[in-house]
Amino acid sequence: MDGEELTEQETALYDRQIRVWGADAQRRLSKAHILVCGINGTTAEFCKNIVLAGVGSLTLVDDRVATEEALSANFLIPSDESVYGGKTLTELCRDSLKDFNPMVRVSVEKGDLSNFGGEFYSKFDVVVISCCSLSTKQKLEETIECQHNYPSFEESISVPWKALPRKMSKLYFAMRVIERFEDAEQRKPGEVSIADLPGVLKLKNEFCEAQSLKESHIPDALLERLVTDPREFPPVCPIIGGILGQEVIKAISGKGEPLKNFFFFDAMDGKGIIEDLSNNTGS
């Protein structure tokens, strides 16, 4: 990302934010290449934020065809079925994002994540993953070369539950259970319903026994709430997408340390919590 200076056009367009974080940070952003795999309401908000911030390029991967259900959370999809009918989520989002900032190159890459090798991912400075299974995330982490001082995803989720802080967000434990259930049942993220609750509760009990925790450590009511309606809650998407955009901008620009290393937001109480999951986690 080092090398070229900002053009006169870039300097004029990004004048306000240059005053906030400086020309060097903006130059780093303008040379950054971002990959987003998996389009939903949250990543749509993220894409909007980094396109407005002025990254060099944004590549989208998601071959799913747009549906009426996707409209509720993804504001980048036109509401007219004659426009979105038969098109993929990435095609529609690409067209909308180009209008936000014509100076950012927005493109679509077709294909399945599992078919892309390390050479493909090496073209990008930041890779954002959403809408994929636990096993897919773990495989991608093995494929993508990273430069970081933070624990890897695999290291973080491997920390024994007994070693985590006593006030650790219950959302973390509940999400781990549901994610494992989806993986075991070969479901895509969000493909759970209230009919799956008995199986989810059974897996929770097995988890708690294996981790030497009481079954009450993960409230049944929380799991029931999460499987009853696993769809995105539209008002939350701008919040999470905004925070994700902020952290990626930090990582690229060097202006501030990205949060370490998990962020949880509970729409029920409107609170966001940062949790540090690493082998150095204390109780």
PLM regions with names:
Residues 1-283:
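Adenine nucleotide-associated cytosolic modules
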